[in-house]
């Protein structure tokens, strides 16, 4: 259909592709997929190297550029993201005898906390049973919800009483 035969059609009529033919599967998949954030890429590369190993600034720039960021246009954004991560304490500059002066590593406390959080999330997912579509909430959740409602009803009609005798003059 896409090829035009010279003898069959006039020069004035052109073949216009329909919407389904114009959008290929690769176009649709690239639109739906989004790039990860720069901070996520930086933290991921540092986490892959573990706590003891350090990563140079050039390696981080390469990792960010591989994910699809144009580093010639986004150097200011890269610097800003690095500075924010340093201010938050998620990463730190290496000042001891390890690596170059521009090398960075993941903060030990943050790395340990993230490992504990990941383990807790996995434990919760294992312990939770998937609910059926028509199933009601579990009993502990219902108790919490009902207690919240009762507290709201208790305090709904209560008026505030003035503290002490502010308005009374002796």
Curated annotation (Swiss-Prot):
<dbReference type="GO" id="GO:0030154">
    <property type="term" value="P:cell differentiation"/>
</dbReference>
<keyword id="KW-0221">Differentiation</keyword>
<dbReference type="Pfam" id="PF00538">
    <property type="entry name" value="Linker_histone"/>
</dbReference>
<dbReference type="GO" id="GO:0007283">
    <property type="term" value="P:spermatogenesis"/>
</dbReference>
<comment type="similarity">
    <text>Belongs to the histone H1/H5 family.</text>
</comment>
<keyword id="KW-0156">Chromatin regulator</keyword>
<feature type="domain" description="H15">
    <location>
        <begin position="34"/>
        <end position="108"/>
    </location>
</feature>
<dbReference type="InterPro" id="IPR036390">
    <property type="entry name" value="WH_DNA-bd_sf"/>
</dbReference>
<dbReference type="GO" id="GO:0005634">
    <property type="term" value="C:nucleus"/>
</dbReference>
<keyword id="KW-0805">Transcription regulation</keyword>
<keyword id="KW-0597">Phosphoprotein</keyword>
<dbReference type="GO" id="GO:0030261">
    <property type="term" value="P:chromosome condensation"/>
</dbReference>
<dbReference type="InterPro" id="IPR005818">
    <property type="entry name" value="Histone_H1/H5_H15"/>
</dbReference>
<keyword id="KW-0217">Developmental protein</keyword>
<comment type="function">
    <text>DNA-binding protein that may be implicated in chromatin remodeling and/or transcriptional regulation during spermiogenesis, the process of spermatid maturation into spermatozoa.</text>
</comment>
<keyword id="KW-0744">Spermatogenesis</keyword>
<dbReference type="GO" id="GO:0006334">
    <property type="term" value="P:nucleosome assembly"/>
</dbReference>
<dbReference type="GO" id="GO:0000786">
    <property type="term" value="C:nucleosome"/>
</dbReference>
<feature type="region of interest" description="Disordered">
    <location>
        <begin position="118"/>
        <end position="140"/>
    </location>
</feature>
<dbReference type="GO" id="GO:0003677">
    <property type="term" value="F:DNA binding"/>
</dbReference>
<keyword id="KW-0158">Chromosome</keyword>
<dbReference type="InterPro" id="IPR036388">
    <property type="entry name" value="WH-like_DNA-bd_sf"/>
</dbReference>
<keyword id="KW-0804">Transcription</keyword>
<keyword id="KW-0539">Nucleus</keyword>
<feature type="modified residue" description="Phosphoserine">
    <location>
        <position position="56"/>
    </location>
</feature>
<protein>
    <recommendedName>
        <fullName>Histone H1.9</fullName>
    </recommendedName>
</protein>
<keyword id="KW-0238">DNA-binding</keyword>
